[in-house]
Amino acid sequence: MASGRLIKFVVFELLEFAAFSIPTLVITEQFATAYQGTRARSDNTHYWLIISCSIAYVALVTLLIWVPVKVILHKKRYIYRKIKGWRPVLMMCVVLTTLPCLTFSIAVTEVQKSINGSADVLPDMLPDLPVSLVLLSLIMVDIIEKLRIYPLRGSQKSSENGHIHSTSLQHIKTVTEQVRQSPENAASPQATNSTQVSQPSGAMTRSQESVFMGPQEPSCDSGILRMMSRRDVRAELFLWSFLLWSDTIEMVRVAGHPNVYKSSWLYPVYIFSFISLLRITFTPQNPLLNSLSVLLQDLPFVFVRLGLIIALGTITPVLGLCKNILVTLSYIYFNYLTRIRIFSAFEMSPF
């Protein structure tokens, strides 16, 4: 009987291969259907030629790239351990699947324009299934790669408290509290007093003031609250993987708006959406990921969304534009401007 580890490995590999191959076949079938409209309806030669070429492409990249890389990563573990900061499987999916699919999506629109002779007679909306399938496949491969290190049975508690990291202000204590809680200072008060510098009474009063500790979290130790407060890191992988790409998903959906895909705005939307997807090739704990998220997604999306709103109106949410602006400005301010002298003074007050 096959072990659970072997079954997990086989299922994961089949799902990844399906996510690698199916989007290309679906997008090229859509392109073949659009191209067939330029030919005689009784002649299906070009349709089946495009379909056969797409099948040949998938088979070729599978045999020459996908399978050899997978075998090397599985058999030669020392090579896999030498790869730092990026994920080969996601790189193959982005380059060999996502890039051709987005290219064929643009080609479908151009073919439909050439058929009708004008962009005004194009369909009201582009089909949502092909592009959504491309993004869904990429996100699923990302989730599978993250799930590999976890067992699928048993409980795995989350090590993070709601992704809310404690700030340094929440752990600062006053000088008098530290002296009171220190056993060495309690054992030798004379030595402590001899090394301290005398301070004015006003300064001592200010130092004894409590610092902002943040709101207290509720205790859910019994009853239905305990059941509702359960958290598993594997379930959170699905949640945060989709939330991480919600901005790119919304941007790609904008491309289906008639005012976008009937104009030249389709190109920058797809190009910068693909650039933002390059972040998925990096490991989740890569120290450069925060910088790359701003440089590859939020900063370019500021200009794309601003241009769309100015040229075509609010076809993209203003909230998305505000999010990109605030994320970019906060990253620059807290990581770089706070190192300048005028912004580097430590603020003790919570208000």
UniProtKB/Swiss-Prot annotation:
Membrane-crossing segments per the record: 7-27, 49-69, 88-108, 121-141, 264-284, 301-321
Ranges where the record places region Disordered: 177-216
Bias (Polar residues) ranges: 177-210
Disulfide bonds, paired cysteine numbers: none
Membrane topology designation: Multi-pass membrane protein
Subcellular locations according to the entry: Membrane
Glycosylation sites: 193
Annotated InterPro entries: Uncharacterised_FAM23-like_TM
Keyword terms of this UniProt record: Glycoprotein, Membrane, Transmembrane, Transmembrane helix
Cellular component, GO, one term: membrane
Coiled-coil segments: none
Homology family: Belongs to the TMEM236 family.
Stored PANTHER family: TRANSMEMBRANE PROTEIN 236
Name of this chain's protein: Transmembrane protein 236
Taxonomy of the source species: Eukaryota, Metazoa, Chordata, Craniata, Vertebrata
